[in-house]
């Protein structure tokens, strides 16, 4: 029902559209994915939060613990809720040594003081979602690890540079030639991400 000329059949999506509400006019709450996601999850404009930047993998939580979310709203209405995919709204990571900061080097791209074996707090399951399977940030910044509910799936952490050597000779540069930072990891043709912590079993490869 969404596209009569489509070559691929989508009966499940079509049924959802017929039995629910189709949103055909959408507007973004921000120019980046994080602010847009914050607006979708909370129903609030991102500029109403005290945070204005700090967009990287280990950012602190954006959503206040008492904030109503689409997850808690739907759960209160009797639905079972889940959050799957990119989160990048901040998590409360536990530290190995509370006397030290989380980031141990000024470049942010080496090992950190993060305890990946400890429960991860202030995530989706504390914000109205019964189940979650998320990537904490985005695919171009550490930590590269999956989090199921409040636990890192594979807490055995290494650096991306240990798994994928730095290779610039086969790299296809972007239009602005931004893929030249010394902390970047290059692998095969055009694949690029920042050096940092990753689960040993995490695979950053095309299937």
Where are these regions (language model features)?
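Formylglycine-dependent sulfatase
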Residues: 1-207
């Amino acid at each position: 029902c969404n596209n009569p000329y489509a070559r691929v059949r989508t009966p499940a999506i079509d049924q959802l559209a017929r039995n629910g509400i189709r949103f055909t006019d959408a507007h973004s709450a921000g120019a980046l994915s994080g602010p847009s996601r914050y607006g979708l999850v909370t129903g609030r404009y991102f500029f109403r939060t005290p945070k204005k930047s700090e967009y990287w993998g280990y950012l602190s939580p954006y959503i206040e613990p008492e904030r109503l979310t689409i997850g808690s709203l739907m759960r209160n209405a009797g639905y079972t809720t889940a959050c799957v995919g990119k989160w990048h709204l901040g998590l409360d990571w536990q530290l190995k040594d509370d006397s030290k900061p989380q980031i141990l080097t000024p470049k942010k791209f080496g090992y950190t003081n993060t305890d990946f074996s400890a429960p991860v707090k202030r995530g989706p399951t504390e914000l109205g979602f019964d189940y979650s399977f998320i990537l904490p940030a985005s695919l171009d910044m550490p930590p590269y690890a999956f989090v199921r509910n409040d636990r890192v799936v594979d807490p055995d952490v290494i650096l991306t540079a240990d798994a994928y050597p730095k290779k610039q000779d086969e790299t296809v540069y972007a239009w602005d030639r931004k893929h030249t930072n010394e902390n970047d990891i290059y692998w095969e043709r055009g694949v690029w991400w920042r050096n940092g912590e990753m689960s040993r079993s995490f695979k950053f490869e095309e299937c």
